[in-house]
């Protein structure tokens, strides 16, 4: 199954690259093809920045290129960040070429309430593992999960599988099992929904989901695709 998934991903990536090239970088007519240089914007640092109320945001940096030319000074940065109010704020970095092509990137700054499970969590590789059948396969260090507030008392989880496919297999975020949770006063976690964008399927269930706000830890067992993922993680 893993080989089948990998092959499908490689095929769709090749198709997507072709489409981007045709749509985003070429200006074709019946008699000729004029190649137009593409602009790109890249971010330094993390995509998500977690700050306490009243904290100071230090811009990690960004860069933009038009082909091989540096056009960072042409980037327009738009932000409505308010560190004095809890919430999630987007910072948009955008550049527009003379041909009218637009490239942009976004960073999200979360002003986190310390009484909520919001933050960037790193998987405890020594105590996290996947069980397919009778085998037990441990996680590798460095996998992370982002938990963000939805603003209605529920939370968005970037990957219930703790980065198993996103980081471990290198398949990217489209193969993360993202979804939403509710956390009870006693710390018990309820999985409200889940979905893998690439495979278009969901988890069967969550077992023993627990959040310890004081300790900054989350743990759960996820049953997905006839496998069990035991994930323990600690807030950064």
Predicted feature descriptions by range:
Residues 37-69, 161:
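Solvent-exposed, low-complexity, repeat-rich "mucin-like" stalks and linkers
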Residues 63-65, 94, 108-110, 122, ...:
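Residue-level recognition of well-ordered beta-strand positions that form the cores
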């Amino acid at each position: 199954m893993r080989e089948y998934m990998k092959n499908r991903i490689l095929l769709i990536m090749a198709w997507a690259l072709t489409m981007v090239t045709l749509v985003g970088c070429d200006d074709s007519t019946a008699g000729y093809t004029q190649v137009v240089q593409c602009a790109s914007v890249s971010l330094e640092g993390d995509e998500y920045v977690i700050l306490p109320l009243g904290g100071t945001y230090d811009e990690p940096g960004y860069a933009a290129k038009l082909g091989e030319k540096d056009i960072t000074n042409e980037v327009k940065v738009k932000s409505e960040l308010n560190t004095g109010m809890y919430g999630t704020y987007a910072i948009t970095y955008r550049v527009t070429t003379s041909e009218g092509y637009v490239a942009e990137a976004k960073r999200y700054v979360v002003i986190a309430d310390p009484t909520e499970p919001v933050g960037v969590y790193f998987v405890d590789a020594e105590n996290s593992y996947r069980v397919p059948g009778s085998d037990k396969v441990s996680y590798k260090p460095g996998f992370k999960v982002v938990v963000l507030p939805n603003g209605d008392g529920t939370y968005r989880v970037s990957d219930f599988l703790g980065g198993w496919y996103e980081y471990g297999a290198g398949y990217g975020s489209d193969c993360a099992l993202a979804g939403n949770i509710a956390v009870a006063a006693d710390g018990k976690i309820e999985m409200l929904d889940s979905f893998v964008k690439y495979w278009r399927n969901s988890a069967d269930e969550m077992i023993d989901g627990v959040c310890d706000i004081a300790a900054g830890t989350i743990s759960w067992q996820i049953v997905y695709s006839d496998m069990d993922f035991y994930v323990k993680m600690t807030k950064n």
